[in-house]
Amino acid sequence: MEETPGRTPELSLEDTFLRAVAGLPEEDVRAEVVAEALGYLQQGFDAHYAGVGTTDEDVLVGDNAYALAVETIARLDEPRFVAVASRMIRDGAGRIAAGGVVSLQTWTPHLAGLLDIISEEGEERSEARIRAAAAGRSG
């Protein structure tokens, strides 16, 4: 997986999360909503931090995607999901502002936090599921 400085990984956060959730013993309708919000969040980062020459239109597209991410996850009416998503935005933007690269490693603890809210099996097990899903295996 090639990563471009200042961008999210080419790997889809939405698909990775859905693969991780697929390994859970029980289905949870919240997982689809969280995955959808992750897709919007990644679109926002990609638009805002596409690299050199980000235009005003890119910023507007990114802002709209962030708004859709927040609106989507807020449908769950569970502050824990919103808190983790907020940390994802803060940590990713902070890393980029410091000149770093946003990689899957950056997102893994946050994705695990979201998964743990759904699975209640602990952050360590949730992180293992995320890593397995990123490698193309179900958790």
Regions found by a protein language model. Name each.
Residues 1-139:
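All-alpha prenyltransferase/terpene-synthase fold signal
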